[in-house]
């Protein structure tokens, strides 16, 4: 029996580019060009924990354009084919990623964690993470949505195995 590693979403195809099958990709990585480290991408719209629903695609050419990637994928040769990819997620297999340093996490590792503060107030689950100029921000949904900065003064403990996060954050914010 083959064990299949789960996929980690690294970006999203946002639009076709030109008439020769190029697509615009919005990366969800710290560095815009990080996706260039992976010559084979998985494309799909489904659950990344079920990679059999995704299709493998090889990158023929790619370049950075502002905060987007312009990419020519093998087998996508005209604008109509490129348009059919719009909205698809770009992922790579988890075991292809380098291990994060101590105290660092992939965003995909943070999504789904249950967040509580030091007073044991349950804030809900991390449903998204986004970058700002200064730091990353967690989107936590429970009884309401909270934006919690992902900085050392606020995030006190992350337990990816236990799926929990302890924060020093006022429940009124």
From Swiss-Prot:
UniProt keyword annotations, A-Z: Chaperone, Cytoplasm, Ribosome biogenesis, rRNA processing
GO biological process terms, semicolon-separated: ribosomal small subunit biogenesis; rRNA processing
Presence of keyword Chaperone: yes
InterPro entries referenced in this protein's UniProt entry, alphabetically: PRC_barrel-like_sf (IPR011033), PRC_RimM (IPR056792), RimM (IPR011961), RimM_N (IPR002676), RimM_N_sf (IPR036976), Transl_B-barrel_sf (IPR009000)
Record-level Gene Ontology MF annotations: ribosome binding
Domain PRC barrel: 102-173
Cellular component terms per the entry's GO annotation: cytoplasm; ribosome
Cellular compartments annotated: Cytoplasm
Family: Belongs to the RimM family.
HAMAP family for this protein: Ribosome_mat_RimM
Role description: An accessory protein needed during the final step in the assembly of 30S ribosomal subunit, possibly for assembly of the head region. Essential for efficient processing of 16S rRNA. May be needed both before and after RbfA during the maturation of 16S rRNA. It has affinity for free ribosomal 30S subunits but not for 70S ribosomes.
Note on domains (UniProt): The PRC barrel domain binds ribosomal protein uS19.
Subunit (UniProt): Binds ribosomal protein uS19.
Name of the molecule in the record: Ribosome maturation factor RimM
Organism (species): Methylobacillus flagellatus (strain ATCC 51484 / DSM 6875 / VKM B-1610 / KT)
């Amino acid at each position: 029996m083959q064990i299949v590693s789960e996929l980690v979403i690294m970006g999203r195809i946002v639009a076709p580019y030109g008439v020769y099958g190029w697509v615009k990709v919005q990366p969800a990585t710290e560095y815009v060009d990080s996706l260039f480290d992976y010559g084979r991408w998985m494309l799909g719209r489904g659950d990344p924990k079920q990679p059999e629903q995704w299709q493998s695609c090889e990158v023929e050419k790619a370049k950075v354009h502002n905060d987007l990637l312009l990419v020519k994928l093998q087998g996508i040769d005209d604008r109509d084919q490129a348009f059919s990819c719009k909205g698809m997620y770009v992922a790579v297999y988890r075991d292809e990623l380098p291990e994060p340093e101590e105290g660092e996490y992939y965003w995909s590792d943070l999504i789904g964690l249950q967040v509580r503060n030091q007073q044991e107030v349950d804030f809900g689950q991390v449903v998204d993470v986004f970058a700002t100029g200064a730091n990353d921000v967690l989107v936590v949904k429970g009884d309401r949505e909270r934006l919690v900065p992902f900085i050392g003064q606020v995030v006190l403990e992350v337990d990816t195995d236990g799926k929990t996060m302890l924060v020093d954050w006022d429940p009124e914010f």
